[in-house]
């Protein structure tokens, strides 16, 4: 892919970042972010227009292609108030907080490849949907849905039922039964699981989403930088829980929802980290000489992040982070390079895992890989590349192949002996949000290649 093609897909800013950060002597794509204040955050009201614009773009440009790719002529998304299908909110305009009564979305792919977007609802959704029912009671609504399906005569009708993928299993048993009841036997036989479409819909990023995603990740990294600084931490006073709550409240003040509570922990000389322990680190008051770790995730403009970074609290008289810890960061970055270097279109998550583990083992790196897709969910559907408690193949999710225009949490850890700590292991738990463009991996807001230092 040449420079102009990359810019056309990613936008000039992200393409420039990708093309210039590889020439440095430092680990590629490193970036220091100091504060979330360096990034604009829209008010709740201001978010509606860009969110709806991105939803419409996805419906117009992605959905027709993905329905053709997965060989579906029609896709039904049917749910009820307070029992919404996980995919529902990725399809409807904002502001929207719940399905209304029984809400039915119908997507019909026509012979020319375009997709009609229809709603069979008591409360019409408006743009970008066309209402296909004049109103009535619940029985009339179901009758109208059945008649609409028959009139369109689709050969393969996708419904959201799945044994293996939770996000593709949003059609409840009762609604599934009712759907079969209102369809002639011939049409009921055309119902097929839509799980492949749901996964592709949720994992694929549009051009507009890729333009804004680096900004969102930058906000998350900025809050981590604030938290791992003397603005928040007073050694000997501040606890790991204090820092976690700072992160929680900071995102709250920005109006940004978190999708899990922030984790903050510390590793310390004299508190062993065993080579075979899945995770190292404890809670308590932060002291000089501590190694800090945090894991945070936010969602903004319908896109989620997942980020882990490391910090250090210098001892009295220390000017630099100990050389052993700096070397451990470099090893962590090297492990990331092994992982991202094995990304290839069509390659399964299990294959990427196997290749990465082999490369790390050959290099003598004690590493663990547990990388996952990101997008409209923090733990989004897509290829699973290892799990913290399973470094072998993962059935089904691990067999899913990599596609272009998908985003991942490049997540895992390495353990390395620190000479300054008498050979005690330190665990470097690293995670950054990154785009796979079909040829290479680009960190959306750079990655951590140097320590946060609390001074």
Where are these regions (language model features)?
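N-terminal secretory signal peptides that target proteins for export/translocation
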Residues: 1-6
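Active-site neighborhoods and metal-handling regions in enzymes and metal-associated proteins
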Residues: 26-455
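Short amphipathic alpha-helical "recognition" segments used for binding
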Residues: 8-11, 415
């Amino acid at each position: 892919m040449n420079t102009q093609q990359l810019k056309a897909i990613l936008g000039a800013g992200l393409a420039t970042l990708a093309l210039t950060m590889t020439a440095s002597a430092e680990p590629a794509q490193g970036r220091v972010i100091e504060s979330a204040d360096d990034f604009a955050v829209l008010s709740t009201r201001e978010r509606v227009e860009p969110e709806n614009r991105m939803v419409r773009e996805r419906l117009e440009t992605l959905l027709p292609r993905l329905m053709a790719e997965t060989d579906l002529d029609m896709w039904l998304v049917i749910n009820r108030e307070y029992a919404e299908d996980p995919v529902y909110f990725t399809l409807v305009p904002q502001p929207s907080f719940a399905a209304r009564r029984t809400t039915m979305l119908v997507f019909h792919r026509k012979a020319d490849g375009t997709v009609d977007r229809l709603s069979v609802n008591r409360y019409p959704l408006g743009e970008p949907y066309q209402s296909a029912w004049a109103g009535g009671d619940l029985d009339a609504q179901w009758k109208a849905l059945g008649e609409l399906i028959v009139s369109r005569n689709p050969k393969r009708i996708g419904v959201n039922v799945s044994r293996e993928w939770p996000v593709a299993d949003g059609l409840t048993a009762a609604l599934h039964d009712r759907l079969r009841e209102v369809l002639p036997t011939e049409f009921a036989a055309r119902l097929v699981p839509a799980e492949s479409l749901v996964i592709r819909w949720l994992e694929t990023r549009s051009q507009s989403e890729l333009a804004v995603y680096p900004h969102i990740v930058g906000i998350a990294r900025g809050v981590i930088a604030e938290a791992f600084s003397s603005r928040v931490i007073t050694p000997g006073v501040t606890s790991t829980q204090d820092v976690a709550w700072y992160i929680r409240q900071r995102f709250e003040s920005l109006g940004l929802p978190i999708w899990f509570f922030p984790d903050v922990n510390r590793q310390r000389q004299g508190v062993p980290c065993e080579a075979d322990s899945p995770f190292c680190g404890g809670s308590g008051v932060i002291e000089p000489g501590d190694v800090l770790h945090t894991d945070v995730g936010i969602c903004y403009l319908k896109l989620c992040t997942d980020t882990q970074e490391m910090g250090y609290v210098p001892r009295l008289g220390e000017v630099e982070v100990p050389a052993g810890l700096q070397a451990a960061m470099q090893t962590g970055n090297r492990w990331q390079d092994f992982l991202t270097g094995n990304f290839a279109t069509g390659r399964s998550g299990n294959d990427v895992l196997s290749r990465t583990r082999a490369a790390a083992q050959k290099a003598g790196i004690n590493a663990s890989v547990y990388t996952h897709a990101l997008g409209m969910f923090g733990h989004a559907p897509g290829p699973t590349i290892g799990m913290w408690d399973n470094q072998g193949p993962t059935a089904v999710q691990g067999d899913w192949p990599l596609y272009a225009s998908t985003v991942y949490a490049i997540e895992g850890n390495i353990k390395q002996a620190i000479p300054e700590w008498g050979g005690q292991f330190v665990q470097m738990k690293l995670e950054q949000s990154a785009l796979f463009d079909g040829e290479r991996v680009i960190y959306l807001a750079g990655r951590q290649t140097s320590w946060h230092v609390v001074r």
